[in-house]
Amino acid sequence: IHAASNASPNFFSRHPVEVIKSNMNGVDNLLSYGLRHGMKRFLFVSSGEVYGESDGRIFTEDYSGYVDCMSPRSCYPSSKRAAETLCVSYMSEYGAGVVIARPCHTYGPDFSENDNRVYAQFIRNALRGEDIVMKSTGSQFRSWSYVVDCASAILYILLKGKNGEAYNIADEASNISIRELAEITASMVGRKVVMEVPDETERKGYNPVSKSVYSV
């Protein structure tokens, strides 16, 4: 199971070259090593960012939307797309057994202090007794999955998935806007939602997709 990838939006804006190299080289190195050492199956943990811009439809596994290749922020979705293609190319050329998982936004109790994903920011605000700080309108609509459910789905795909196929990981009961997430978090600790202007680095790291809802 290859799940090693830096998913920090701040890292995307500051180190786009390293993001591309790590996503591509990681898959290449592991598949090459695995084939030399009797690998039975390889599962690549990709991302829903491969879907690109939404046209309003729910993201099914065969959907492919626009990604601006001239934007450094596209280092992440573009390299994840290329890494998926590399996986199936290894299958086609060398007979590797590969499956791909595309988790939606995953949340859980264990994250680093410098994690700047939106749910982590909200939880830190709540634990400190602060108002919940939003740095956008919060209209972005997302699918979410609890980390334990995501891990279970990854194992299921590894064992039961069809070679060369990609599978969404999502919970249709957990689709919510960023604004709603902020309001729920604020209500749990008796605080309010406030707006703050993001700095330039934060803005560059934001996912431009306004609606990211997965089929299940």
Regions found by a protein language model. Name each.
Residues 14-32, 36, 40-41, 50-101, ...:
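Catalytic helix-loop patch of NAD(P)-dependent Rossmann-fold dehydrogenases
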Residues 126-216:
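C-terminal substrate-binding subdomain of Rossmann-fold SDR/epimerase-dehydratase oxidoreductases
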